[in-house]
Each structure stands twice: as C-alpha cells, then as structure tokens.
C-alpha cells in the first residue's frame, strides 16, 4: 500500500464520542451524526471517524472512537445539541493512504496500512489518534473511498 507523509493542520471537529465495538458503535454514531447535521443544517467541511485505541490491545467493549464532522474554527454548538462534543483533532505529521472499502470491511485496508508502515524504519507511530476521512457517500455508492491517517514521528524521536 502506497502512502505519503504529510503535515496536517489541527481540525475543529463536532460529533459524538463512542465506546464499544467499532463495528457497532461507528455506524450508530454516523446515524446520530447525520440526524444532528440535518436537524441543525450544519455545513460539514468533511466527515471523519477518529480512533483512539489499538483493537489488538484493547477489549472491544472499551474501544473509543468519535464520529464527527469538520467545522470552521469559529463554530459554536447550536442549542440543544445533546451529547455532541466540540473539540480539536490534533495536527502534526501523519502517514496518509487512500483505500476503497467494500462490504463495510474497514479493517482490511487499515491492517494493510499498519503492516506497510511498520516496515518503514524511518517512522514510528506517535501518540495521537488515527482517523479516516470519507471521500464519498458509501451508503449511496455501495463502497467507501477513504483517506486513512496514522500519526507518525521520525524514528528515534
């Protein structure tokens, strides 16, 4: 899997923080997010899922993720945005790869990306969350095109 190393700016994000098995919580979170975006006429700059844990080290019921939209830096939450978080997604150096997800199998491209990145001795993972940006509406198109972001730092830092 090909990837690039990019400097990514901090993003302002709004949405829902979830805990539990990602294959259940993330789709439910996007349903909630879509309702909130529609009800409050939010104009998202991008749709993202943010992942805070390693599923090979954390039990499924404890996995943390956010389903969010990128919003302008001066965005404020509308009244009655129950359960919605507004926070920053840290910027910095990230390895970035594009993938097509079919049959809702998001795990396979992520595993391929991590495997490829671990082979690169120049970089190691940094202590920031991973995230993916959705480039299309997979419910409509039948597949998802995503950009995957893994935080990295130069080895030895």
Curated annotation (Swiss-Prot):
Subcellular localization: Cytoplasm
Gene3D superfamilies noted in UniProt: Regulatory factor, effector binding domain
UniProt entry keywords in alphabetical sequence: Cytoplasm, Stress response
Matching InterPro entries: AraC_E-bd, DNA_gyrase_inhibitor, DNA_gyrase_inhibitor_GyrI, GyrI-like, Reg_factor_effector_dom_sf
Main function: Inhibits the supercoiling activity of DNA gyrase. Acts by inhibiting DNA gyrase at an early step, prior to (or at the step of) binding of DNA by the gyrase. It protects cells against toxins that target DNA gyrase, by inhibiting activity of these toxins and reducing the formation of lethal double-strand breaks in the cell.
Complex and partners: Interacts with DNA gyrase.
Name recorded for this polypeptide: DNA gyrase inhibitor
Organism this protein belongs to: Cronobacter sakazakii (strain ATCC BAA-894)
Encoding gene (name): sbmC
């Amino acid at each position: 899997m090909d990837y690039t190393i990019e400097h990514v700016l901090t993003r302002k994000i709004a949405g829902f923080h979830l805990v539990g098995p990602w294959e259940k919580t993330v789709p439910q979170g996007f349903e909630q997010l879509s309702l909130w975006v529609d009800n409050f006429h939010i104009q998202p700059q991008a749709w993202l899922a943010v992942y805070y844990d390693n599923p090979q080290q954390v039990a499924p019921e404890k996995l943390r993720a956010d389903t969010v939209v990128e919003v302008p830096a001066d965005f404020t939450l509308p009244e009655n945005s129950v359960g919605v978080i507004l926070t920053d997604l840290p910027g910095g150096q990230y390895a970035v790869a594009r993938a097509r997800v079919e049959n809702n199998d998001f795990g396979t491209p992520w595993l391929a990306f991590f495997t490829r990145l671990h082979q690169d001795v120049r970089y190691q993972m940094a202590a920031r969350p991973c995230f993916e940006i959705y480039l299309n509406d997979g419910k409509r198109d039948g597949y998802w095109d995503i950009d995957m972001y893994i935080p990295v730092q130069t080895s030895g830092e």
